[in-house]
Amino acid sequence: MSNTSSYEKNNPDNLKHNGITIDSEFLTQEPITIPSNGSAVSIDETGSGSKWQDFKDSFKRVKPIEVDPNLSEAEKVAIITAQTPLKHHLKNRHLQMIAIGGAIGTGLLVGSGTALRTGGPASLLIGWGSTGTMIYAMVMALGELAVIFPISGGFTTYATRFIDESFGYANNFNYMLQWLVVLPLEIVSASITVNFWGTDPKYRDGFVALFWLAIVIINMFGVKGYGEAEFVFSFIKVITVVGFIILGIILNCGGGPTGGYIGGKYWHDPGAFAGDTPGAKFKGVCSVFVTAAFSFAGSELVGLAASESVEPRKSVPKAAKQVFWRITLFYILSLLMIGLLVPYNDKSLIGASSVDAAASPFVIAIKTHGIKGLPSVVNVVILIAVLSVGNSAIYACSRTMVALAEQRFLPEIFSYVDRKGRPLVGIAVTSAFGLIAFVAASKKEGEVFNWLLALSGLSSLFTWGGICICHIRFRKALAAQGRGLDELSFKSPTGVWGSYWGLFMVIIMFIAQFYVAVFPVGDSPSAEGFFEAYLSFPLVMVMYIGHKIYKRNWKLFIPAEKMDIDTGRREVDLDLLKQEIAEEKAIMATKPRWYRIWNFWC
């Protein structure tokens, strides 16, 4: 089979080096210098000698690269996204902490209480455990792609490149909407969390303004500000969850102030599953799947951050593998403790909202067993978790806007990136949308946010499913173009079958969400309730079909043999890369078996 792609046939003037096509125009661009942090800096970005002038100049736009007008639209997009002006300032420790603790938020700390009430303790382990296997496989697939293509937009660009332009348009717009809506939601959640200490509601707007300003300021420090903030936030969350697990073991064994061994008492009375009939118990398990998926939202941020990391080839695989620990240690063990310490019929869980810190099973477990002071500490951590998600919202949404603009899905102005690597227009638009949080003082607050959330409620599932399909399609393209896995510096431990499993689980969760939307737990069916839970599904379908009609593109997938699997690669010298991989394998072969197994999975 020939290794010559359609891109090479249409562009014979381009250079070819070790099997990789390199556009000759890259050789004529203005000179650049490569500093130790890995960022490409144009000569016109050097300092003027005046700090004030340098500060003003830092907001000026990085000159967009020029591409050959004779190239196809897809080829232009591939080149533009590969030459991202975003800065490479995220270090290994940043990615590690983002992977371990970045997604720990209200879904686990508060939302797990609702899941416990509707499903029971056994349902918690089934729901989070099953969802965790999907998340692990998805992140491993994303890690493989992100190491090869650390390009602008990350996985939001892969969908357009490896699946289909219409799929990328619909999926990526929905992903942008998710984070656009999340910012005001999290700011309001933070202002509600403060009520735990009996704060007067009249100060709600003041707290909204304070939290909004704090999140915006962090992001104005660029990716370095985001990375440092997430490092601190995640470290605090991780320490708290580990501390709770240790405390939970002590309390369960009778070491608390109230004394008395608990063991598996609450698994027998009131029971392991909520509900009186098999049908009710099954519905409870389905509802837990929905909450579990929500709690894992943000797990894909490691892939988005890859394009701004110093050394993605080494840092991204390490960070991706940390997901194993987040799932097993921070989710499964903490939820096991919750199920052992709090019965699913506890009155504090009834009628609680997803942002009510008093309804956090972590707080309830501590309060119930007579420990004073710690509930306030946990509430502070919940507040930090909420602000962490808000911080990630501006980061993810602004970068997604840049990628959408580079793919011609948004006006070109949204691709504005200044000399400090900040997507200023994206940050400004996302921050402005966050001002909707001031509706917190309105009586219609709940209704407004329910419908805002409905617009992107299933966004994470679409994103995760899209990543799995991208990985499957990429592997098919390698085979179709006569390329081997030996040119991959990092291969997903779960392989392509892991992506098939992840896609299967995403479909199962869509079905579970549909079932719960039609037949809600503890409530009667209603059209309003259904669309609040499932509105984003028809919305994505409308965007997908609408784009197909507009572009008159009726192909389901880009043919595997025509996919561009070269532009944007981190390493262009495949022979050198293969040699380095062989050396790394030889070194690993000298290690003990237990270490090799550990390194493969973790």
Curated annotation (Swiss-Prot):
Q: How is it modified after translation?
A: Active permease is phosphorylated. The addition of glutamine causes rapid dephosphorylation and inactivation of the permease. Ubiquitination by RSP5 and the RSP5-associated proteins BUL1 and BUL2, leads the addition of poly-ubiquitin chains being specifically formed by linkage through the lysine 63 residue of ubiquitin and mediates ammonium-induced endocytosis and degradation in the vacuole.
| GO molecular function list | amino acid transmembrane transporter activity; beta-alanine transmembrane transporter activity; L-phenylalanine transmembrane transporter activity; L-proline transmembrane transporter activity; polyamine transmembrane transporter activity
Can you locate the Glycyl lysine isopeptide (Lys-Gly) (interchain with G-Cter in ubiquitin) cross-link?
Answer: 76
Role: General amino-acid permease involved in the uptake of all the naturally occurring L-amino-acids, related compounds such as ornithine and citrulline, some D-amino acids, toxic amino acid analogs such as azetidine-2-carboxylate, and the polyamines putrescine and spermidine. Senses its transport substrates to set an appropriate level of transporter activity at the cell surface. Required for FLO11 expression and invasive growth.
Those parts of the protein on the Extracellular side are 117-121, 186-204, 257-280, 343-376, 443-451, 511-529
From the UniProt record, report the name of the gene that encodes this protein.
GAP1
Extent of the signal sequence: none
Question: Could you name the domain of life of the organism this protein comes from?
Answer: Eukaryota
Q: Which family does it belong to?
A: Belongs to the amino acid-polyamine-organocation (APC) superfamily. YAT (TC 2.A.3.10) family.
Ranges in a coiled coil: none
PANTHER family for the chain: AMINO ACID PERMEASE, GENERAL AMINO-ACID PERMEASE GAP1
Instruction: Note the effect listed for residue 297 to V.
Output: Impairs basic amino-acids transport and regulation by these amino-acids
Name the Pfam families for this protein: AA_permease
Predominant cellular place of this UniProt entry's protein: membrane
Output the InterPro entries linked to this UniProt entry.
AA-permease/SLC12A_dom, Amino_acid_permease_CS, Amino_acid_permease_fungi, APC_YAT
Membrane association type: Multi-pass membrane protein
Under what name is this protein listed?
General amino-acid permease GAP1
Query: What does the UniProt entry say about where the protein is found?
Result: Cell membrane; Endoplasmic reticulum membrane
Q: GO:BP terms for this protein?
A: amino acid transmembrane transport; amino acid transport; polyamine transport
Segments spanning the bilayer are 96-116, 122-142, 166-185, 205-224, 238-256, 281-298, 322-342, 377-396, 422-442, 452-472, 492-510, 530-548
Q: Which UniProt keywords apply?
A: Amino-acid transport, Cell membrane, Endoplasmic reticulum, Isopeptide bond, Membrane, Transmembrane, Transmembrane helix, Transport, Ubl conjugation
What is its induction?
Expression is repressed by ammonia. Expression is induced by polyamines. Both GLN3 and NIL1 bind the 5'-GATAAG-3' motif within the GAP1 promoter to activate transcription.
| GO CC terms, sorted | COPII-coated ER to Golgi transport vesicle; endoplasmic reticulum; endoplasmic reticulum membrane; endosome; fungal-type vacuole lumen; membrane; multivesicular body; plasma membrane
Per the UniProt topology annotation, the Cytoplasmic ranges are: 1-95, 143-165, 225-237, 299-321, 397-421, 473-491, 549-602
